[in-house]
């Protein structure tokens, strides 16, 4: 599951290709509203020589939350310190990070929704008043110590906004929601990446990669690197649509960006369960995949593409899903997504 080339989760190779990341806000492609607003807030903070208000980046994985956080620090001309929610296991870990920050530095916490409640409690006064309240000692001899902190900017990133506690969420003065990218935006990202990597690419080659990238820059960059590998070995001088399509077919990434696992999921419901409805536990058992992987990794993109419906009775495939995988609609299924006729004579009776 973690080896999917179209998966949006971070992989080691994604971290190695840092040269593909934009370094300044003007080079960042997509998320126009977020970029424009951030540019205003950054300029205002610079003009006043103040720390930027705390920022929360929310959205699906792979859309550029970490990259944007690094750009914000670079545009502000301050240091950038990065960590993640699961790494900060106790209050002392957070205190060590905060006390080492210089004035107006940026502290980036990825997966901030995974902070423990004890660490969150320490974070509240640090965010609001730039003060750290720590308990020193145990039992009757315990005492509270208040530490003054340099003004700083906390940038949090989360893929699960609903898991953030209300007190923590409300302390971010600049909430930014990132959305999936349009194909045209991803084409720009692919062209820029090809230029950085020194790869010759035609416009239709960039389009072929972009339209299969599932609206996610991280996936686009990964597909670009793999297509480059095929082109290099096969002696292709310039990657056009034909070369890109050939490479992506060998990677089992189809024209919608679906991979072999997506096709297994769709065929499981279409063939084994006549298009549904079928429960997620049954699907998980049939595919030998954990339920959370089905719900959080496989299904979101299929639902976004209008191929799957989640209903109270279970998962159903839409007619578009049957058409995409080349399986005929079961008898009795209507043309409406996720609906079935109760009786064969429904249409004749005007109750389809």
From Swiss-Prot:
Positions annotated to bind ATP: 20-21, 62, 65-67, 128-130, 171, 181, 218
Region span, Small ATPAse domain (RuvB-S): 182-252
UniProt cross-references to Gene3D superfamilies, sorted A to Z: 1.10.8.60, P-loop containing nucleotide triphosphate hydrolases (3.40.50.300), Winged helix-like DNA-binding domain superfamily/Winged helix DNA-binding domain (1.10.10.10)
Regions crossing the membrane: none
A cellular-component GO term for this protein: Holliday junction resolvase complex
Region annotation (Large ATPase domain (RuvB-L)) ranges: 1-181
GO annotation terms (biological process): DNA recombination; DNA repair
Cellular compartment(s): Cytoplasm
Domain of life: Bacteria
Chain positions covered by the region annotation Head domain (RuvB-H): 255-352
EC number(s) given by UniProt: 3.6.4.-
Binding-site list for DNA: 291, 310, 315
Top EC group: hydrolase
Pfam families given in the database record: AAA_lid_4, RuvB_C, RuvB_N
GO terms of molecular function: ATP binding; ATP hydrolysis activity; four-way junction DNA binding; four-way junction helicase activity
Alphabetized UniProt keyword annotations: ATP-binding, Cytoplasm, DNA damage, DNA recombination, DNA repair, DNA-binding, Hydrolase, Nucleotide-binding
Catalytic activity field: ATP + H2O = ADP + phosphate + H(+)
Primary localization: cytoplasm
Annotated function: The RuvA-RuvB-RuvC complex processes Holliday junction (HJ) DNA during genetic recombination and DNA repair, while the RuvA-RuvB complex plays an important role in the rescue of blocked DNA replication forks via replication fork reversal (RFR). RuvA specifically binds to HJ cruciform DNA, conferring on it an open structure. The RuvB hexamer acts as an ATP-dependent pump, pulling dsDNA into and through the RuvAB complex. RuvB forms 2 homohexamers on either side of HJ DNA bound by 1 or 2 RuvA tetramers; 4 subunits per hexamer contact DNA at a time.
Domain description: Has 3 domains, the large (RuvB-L) and small ATPase (RuvB-S) domains and the C-terminal head (RuvB-H) domain. The head domain binds DNA, while the ATPase domains jointly bind ATP, ADP or are empty depending on the state of the subunit in the translocation cycle. During a single DNA translocation step the structure of each domain remains the same, but their relative positions change.
Complex and partners: Homohexamer. Forms an RuvA(8)-RuvB(12)-Holliday junction (HJ) complex. HJ DNA is sandwiched between 2 RuvA tetramers; dsDNA enters through RuvA and exits via RuvB. An RuvB hexamer assembles on each DNA strand where it exits the tetramer. Each RuvB hexamer is contacted by two RuvA subunits (via domain III) on 2 adjacent RuvB subunits; this complex drives branch migration. In the full resolvosome a probable DNA-RuvA(4)-RuvB(12)-RuvC(2) complex forms which resolves the HJ.
Family membership: Belongs to the RuvB family.
Protein name as annotated: Holliday junction branch migration complex subunit RuvB
Protein's organism: Parvibaculum lavamentivorans (strain DS-1 / DSM 13023 / NCIMB 13966)
């Amino acid at each position: 599951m973690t080896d999917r080339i179209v998966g949006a989760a971070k992989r080691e190779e994604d971290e190695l290709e840092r040269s593909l990341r934009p370094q300044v806000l003007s080079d960042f492609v997509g998320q126009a509203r977020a970029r424009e607003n951030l540019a205003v807030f950054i300029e205002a903070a610079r003009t006043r020589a103040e720390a930027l208000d705390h920022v929360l980046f929310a959205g699906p994985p792979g859309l550029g939350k970490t990259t944007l956080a690094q750009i914000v620090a670079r545009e502000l001309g301050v240091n950038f310190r990065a960590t993640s929610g699961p790494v900060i296991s106790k209050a002392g870990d957070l205190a060590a990070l905060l006390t080492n920050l210089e004035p107006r530095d940026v502290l980036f916490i990825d997966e901030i929704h995974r902070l423990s409640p004890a660490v969150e409690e320490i974070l509240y006064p640090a965010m609001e008043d730039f003060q750290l309240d720590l308990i020193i000692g145990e039992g009757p001899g315990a005492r509270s110590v208040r530490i003054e902190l340099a003004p700083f900017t906390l940038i949090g990133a989360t893929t699960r906004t609903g898991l953030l506690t209300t007190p923590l969420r409300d302390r971010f003065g600049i909430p930014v929601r990132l959305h999936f990218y349009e194909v045209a935006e991803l084409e720009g990202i692919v062209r820029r990446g090809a230029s950085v990597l020194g790869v010759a690419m035609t416009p239709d080659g960039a389009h072929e990669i972009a339209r299969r990238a599932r609206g996610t820059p991280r996936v686009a960059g990964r597909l670009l690197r793999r297509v480059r590998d095929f082109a290099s070995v096969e002696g292709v001088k310039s990657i056009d649509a034909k070369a890109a399509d050939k490479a992506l077919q060998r990677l089992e990434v189809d024209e919608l960006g679906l991979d072999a696992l997506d096709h297994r999921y769709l065929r499981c419901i279409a063939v084994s369960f006549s298009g549904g409805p079928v429960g997620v536990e049954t699907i998980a058992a049939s595919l030998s995949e954990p339920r959370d992987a089905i719900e959080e990794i496989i299904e979101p993109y299929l639902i976004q593409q209008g191929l799957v419906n989640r209903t109270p009775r279970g998962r159903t495939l839409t007619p578009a899903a049957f058409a995409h995988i080349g399986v005929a609609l079961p008898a009795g299924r209507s043309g409406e997504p996720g609906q079935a006729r109760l009786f064969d004579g429904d249409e004749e009776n005007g109750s389809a």
